[in-house]
Curated annotation (Swiss-Prot):
Family recorded in the similarity comment: Belongs to the arsA ATPase family.
EC primary class: hydrolase
GO cellular component labels: mitochondrial matrix; mitochondrion; plastid
Principal subcellular localisation of the protein: mitochondrion
Residues at the catalytic site: D106
Name under which the protein is recorded: ATPase GET3C
Enzyme Commission number(s) from the entry: 3.6.-.-
Any GO MF annotation of the entry: ATP hydrolysis activity
Binding, ATP: K77, G78, G79, V80, G81, K82, T83, S84, N328
Organelle transit peptide residues: 1-50
């Protein structure tokens, strides 16, 4: 309950390219040459498709043409390249004139590494090297926890219950160690912090000019908790409100018997109602086909495809719009006689066939992204990757 109320308060408050050569025989010579000197060449090397599933186009024109605000959430199994895909999309949006915010909700942040810039600290920071406004944020749960403590000050459980009109019962709850419970980090603090930022972006006037907001989400489990959190809070708030009414009625009866002072109804019900309305706004945004899209990122392995299929089923159950599937780290065709490479390409082709036959994934627009010969770090490299994926 404390987390619910504090979310309502906290969310209102303001808030060089490193290259790594791999598999030199695969014919990846062009990447280093094209991004050398922080410059992207106009001629990108071409990666042939490994299967005839789709052209591999992301239909970026439809993603960039609308001026109203759009939310894009990129997620999937850990280690598939979600951050690089999200960062490259944010750079692409900004390069096309859309003021953009990119947010990492993953507790193990790598957005700073992707942009080759320090984005830590839990505050929005401008990304260097992009013409249009591009701000980035790594959500830091520890900072939010400190903010919660700052806003609550040194209030004890007794004071908190007094504000609810239930101070007379505080002594009876001493054995529950509520003080320790409130001081401990919530298991869902990452998701609470992310939701609070979504609320800020939706409500604060200073964010109104940003027309694209990209989320680099945590691995699958965290992301599903994030998307289901508004429903969970909505249900919890309803239960808390009913419970308080029952306790207040019982306390009033206690007063009549023992002649205690009248219990005052404080601000809790109104604050809960306000939070309930705001949670409903977030829930509606996550499910709005006109403003939101979840992009699944995966790699061409059976395990990753299976998890992506389950993720899509869960997103469909939550009514979250999904239109695109990125298959990352595909080996391009090569004239090399590398036996290992040939075997891997054949296996990747087989896995792409599994997508075509998967009832959850076959209807999505397939985006094929190649395995590159370098780490994607810094804006020039992200522009290069963005031109390969988002076209």
């Amino acid at each position: 309950m404390a987390a619910l109320l504090l979310l309502n308060r906290v969310s209102r408050s303001t808030s060089s390219i490193s290259l790594h050569r791999v598999a030199g025989t695969l014919g990846f010579n062009s990447f280093n040459a094209q991004i050398h000197g922080d410059r992207i060449s106009g001629t990108l090397f071409r990666v042939r498709s490994l299967a005839t599933l789709a052209e591999g186009a992301s239909h970026f024109n439809e993603m960039v043409s609308v001026n109203q605000r759009k939310y894009y959430l990129l997620g999937g199994k850990g280690g598939v390249g979600k951050t690089s895909c999200a960062a490259s999309l944010a750079v692409k949006f900004a390069s096309h004139g859309h003021p953009t915010i990119v947010v990492s909700t993953d507790p193990a942040h790598s957005l700073s590494d992707s942009f080759s810039q320090d984005l830590s600290g839990g505050v929005l920071k401008p990304v260097q090297g992009v013409d249009s406004p591009l701000l980035a944020l790594e959500i830091t749960p520890e900072i939010m926890k400190d903010e919660i403590k700052r806003q609550t000050g040194d209030k004890s459980v007794k004071n908190m219950m007094d504000s609810m009109g239930l101070g007379m019962f505080a002594g009876e709850l001493g054995d529950l160690n509520l003080e320790d419970m409130l001081n401990a980090a919530s298991p869902g603090i990452d998701e609470i912090a992310a939701i609070s930022k979504v609320l800020q972006f939706m409500e604060a006037p200073e964010y109104s000019r940003f027309t694209r907001i990209v989320f680099d989400t945590a691995p699958t489990g965290h992301t599903l908790r994030l998307l289901s959190l508004p429903d969970f809070y909505d249900s919890s708030i309803s239960k808390i409100t009913k419970l308080k009414k029952k306790i207040t009625a019982a306390a009033s009866a206690f007063k009549l018997v023992f002649g205690k002072k009248e219990i005052q109804q404080k601000e809790l019900p109104n604050e809960l109602d306000q939070l309930k309305e705001r949670m409903e706004k977030v829930r509606n945004v996550f499910r709005d086909v006109d403003t939101t899209e979840f992009v699944i990122v995966t790699i061409p392995t059976v395990m990753a495809i299976n998890e992506s299929s389950r993720l899509h089923a869960s997103l469909r159950k939550e009514n979250v719009p999904v239109h695109r599937l990125i298959v990352n780290q595909l080996l391009p065709q090569s004239e090399s006689d590398c036996k290992f490479c040939s075997i891997r390409r054949k296996e990747q082709t087989r896995v792409l066939g599994l997508i075509q036959n998967d009832t959850e994934l076959s209807g999505l627009k397939l985006i094929q992204s190649p395995l590159l010969d370098a780490e994607i770090r810094g804006v020039p490299a992200l522009k290069f990757m963005g031109d390969l994926i988002w076209k």
